[in-house]
Amino acid sequence: GLHGEAYRGHIFWDELFIFPVLNLRLPTVTRALLRYRYRRLIEARRAAKLAGYAGAMFPWQSGSDGREESPDLHLNPRSGRWNPDPSHRAHHIGIAVAYNVWQFYQATGDLAYLIDYGTELLVEIARFWVSRASYDEERQRYCINGVIGPDEFHSGYPDRPYDGVDNNAYTNVMAVWVILRAIDALTLMPLPNRLDIREKLGLTDAELAQWDRVSRQMFVPFHDGVISQFEGYDKLAELDWERYLQRYGDIQRLDRILEAENDDV
């Protein structure tokens, strides 16, 4: 963006916070900007397939052609060390794309957009999340493991610090939300259009039945009756905030401070 070159002009999920304003004041602009994602749907499908999933996996950092532009390494200027950058595991970017599609429709009632572009995006993102979820026999619930949620500081566990966390609450709940909105979009379409897109995408009754199972049996972690941010969140040690504030003053990048101390968030 205009603030600097740190992100090299890439597109993240920040449009999630901008589109609600545009939807009500300049909806034609939102519609045009949403085409950016649709035009990169082929690349998102390719990325999902390479990762072993179905549907479309949008990149955390997107550029001109829709490939994943997130770096593999990240420099910590406090320690001088280059560490793995696992931000490509922030798969919730696809949730943001789906949310923007649905919010645009809700604000404008533009059914033509859903028919031409939006439903296809929703279906392919829903497919990704259904394939991303794995069934836990013991819990009798579906789990989504190895992701990074909106809290990018927590990117793993002590024994696998860069492999993502399991069952991030935001990700799991919103994955179900995407599945339900994809079904809603299909239902809203006139029957001929619905049959056309189902044929185009090969969307079968059996696949929709699996969507229903995943949406009804998604695991959400709780601790003492409170939703946990992710599985194991309740086991995190509390930071000595006063000591770190006194020592460093600005602790906005606490992840860098702790890494320089050979520690981790």
Where on the chain are the PLM-derived regions?
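Acidic, mature catalytic/reactive cores of soluble proteins
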Residues: 1-20, 24-265
